[in-house]
Regions:
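A short N-terminal beta->alpha junction/helix N-cap motif
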Residues: 3, 24-32, 59-60, 305, ...
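Alpha/beta enzyme core
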Residues: 10-21, 34-59, 66-86, 95-230, ...
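Extended, intrinsically disordered, low-complexity segments
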Residues: 289-334
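Short acidic/histidine-rich active-site segments
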Residues: 235-238, 258, 278-282
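Short catalytic-loop micro-motif centered on adjacent basic/acidic residues
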Residues: 26-30, 91-92, 114, 231-233, ...
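Generic N-terminal amphipathic, Lys/Arg-enriched alpha-helix
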Residues: 1-27, 300-301
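Shared catalytic-loop signature of beta/alpha-barrel
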Residues: 53, 60-64, 265, 274-298, ...
Length: 334
């Protein structure tokens, strides 16, 4: 058993409470490798932001659970080395699908886990979430539950439809499970292809495809039922057009990739939404930089020469999200 506190990590409880009061959201950036982690930590330190290092089940398998634990510990030390005396870094399991997966993560040093039972019948979701909460809280690990289904594909998470969260269920769910935060569905979607062209329309001013608006009325109803309770948005990448254009310019084939407009995420961040998940944007930034380097320097074969620019491009993206979308800059306790 490895306790996350021995790794220098924190859970989400205090940072979420501060975020709700302060009207901002904590960035939850998914990562799969060292370059992504370095970029996340550098961006968080330079903007003085708390941050959630988010790992899917697939990413944990890819990185190896033991190596991942030391990477998280290293992230804390790296932040201190960069000048942050008291970093606030969470290691969070994204979309845990079984009790066993969540337990394994808790036992290996995760400070927060998500149990996603949203695909199950309601009572089964309640029972599974409560089982994870009961175990996690013994070790002061925070738990995120989910109500409602997001469409899209990302790692092992896949659904061809979305179901908005039913506000009438949230009080019962939060009370019976004891979860610390709740992921809801209000129209966000996983992956880079969040909406079909048929679901979107062209903005005459910019000529860009615009997705349907988020269902803020559902969010408002949830906030009314659970005042002050931490809410989470998944599938919140904006799919930056410049990154998509770079990928396509240098041999990619990303057609009709549409994300969530940043102005909608800004609006959500000022509400009880205190955690916003971003994964696809990082993948796009990394891929765009690598493709550009390969095209401009076809003789290059030193991984540092293409992963370095990718890391820099991701850091730029993370800083932008913190400063201009989420508002979590300068929010560290000390």
């Amino acid at each position: 058993m490895v306790n996350y506190k021995d790794l220098g990590l924190v859970n989400t409880k205090e940072m979420f409470a501060k975020a709700i009061k302060g009207g901002y959201a904590i960035p939850a950036f998914n990562f799969n490798n060292m370059e992504q982690m370095q970029a996340i930590i550098k961006a968080a330190v330079e903007t003085k932001s708390p941050v959630i290092l988010q790992v899917s089940k697939g990413a944990r398998q890819y990185a190896n659970a033991t190596l991942l634990r030391y990477m998280a510990q290293g992230a804390v030390e790296y932040a201190k080395e960069l000048g942050c005396a008291h970093p606030e870094i969470v290691l969070h399991l994204d979309h845990g699908d079984t009790f066993e997966t969540c337990k394994s993560c808790i036992d290996s040093g995760f400070s927060s886990v998500m149990i996603d039972g949203s695909h199950l019948p309601y009572e089964e979701n309640v029972a599974l979430t409560k089982k994870v909460v009961d175990y996690a809280h013994q070790f002061d690990v925070t738990v995120e539950g989910e109500l409602g289904v997001l469409a899209g594909v990302e790692d092992e998470v896949s659904s061809d439809h979305h179901t908005y969260t039913d506000p009438e269920e949230v009080i019962d769910f939060a009370t019976r499970t004891g979860c610390d935060s709740l992921a809801i569905s209000i129209g966000t979607s996983h992956g880079a292809y969040k909406f079909t062209p048929e679901q979107s329309h062209i903005d005459p001013a910019t000529g860009r495809m615009v997705p349907p608006p988020l269902a803020f009325e559902v969010l408002d109803a949830v906030m009314e039922k659970l005042p002050g309770f931490p809410i989470v948005l998944h599938g919140s990448s904006s799919v930056p057009e410049e990154e998509v254009e770079t990928i396509n310019k240098y041999g990619g084939a990303l057609k009709a990739a549409i994300g969530i407009p940043e102005e909608e995420l800004r609006k959500a961040a000022k509400s009880a939404v205190c955690k916003i998940n971003i994964d696809s944007d990082s993948r796009l930034a990394m891929t765009a930089a690598i493709r550009k380097t390969f095209a401009e320097k076809p003789a290059e074969f030193d991984p540092r020469k293409y992963l370095g620019p990718a890391r820099d491009n991701m850091e730029k993206l993370y800083k932008h999200k913190i400063l201009n979308v989420l508002g979590s800059d300068n929010k560290l306790a000390q």
